[in-house]
Amino acid sequence: MIQHHLVLDTPSLLALSGNRQVSALIHQAHLDADTRLWVPVLSAIEADVVLAGIAEHIGQLDVIHMLDLDYPAVLAVAQMCRDGVPTGVAAAVHAARHLPEWGSQALVATVEPKAYEGQGVGVFDLNR
């Protein structure tokens, strides 16, 4: 049974190119079947706009599980965005709250933990 569910957000995806903690997390997930990494599609798109090719790169990593948006998710993320939450943060918040595995709880793994203050999700700070 998977014990650790972590949602990677846009800043964490962008940090893959040089942040040791993010790289170590990817490596750890490869070695540990109890850790599952999730990436919201919107976060991957947002990261690829900034760093072309990152979406293709993360799509090739076996330990990354992409999260699509269904209609209720689109509405929830859109509402958060209208409330001033950045798109990638909103997508990660929704993903952490609604993993496709029943009964699962997830943390958002991020290099920008302050973005999640007041969002009602747990955060795994990749700066430590």
Model-flagged regions — what are they?
Residues 66-113:
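Active-site neighborhoods of divalent-metal-dependent phosphate/nucleic-acid chemistry enzymes
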Residues 8-9, 38-41, 85-86, 111, ...:
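Histidine- and aromatic-rich ligand-binding microenvironments
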Residues 61-66, 120-128:
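Active-site regions of enzymes building and remodeling cell-envelope glycoconjugates
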Residues 50, 78-79, 118-121:
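Short, conserved acidic/polar surface loops in the N-terminal third of protein domains
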Residues 1-39, 49-60, 64:
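Short, well-structured N-terminal submotif of metal-dependent ribonuclease cores
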Residues 45-47:
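Alpha-helical substrate-recognition element adjacent to the catalytic core
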Residues 50-54, 109-115:
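Short, polar loop motifs at secondary-structure junctions
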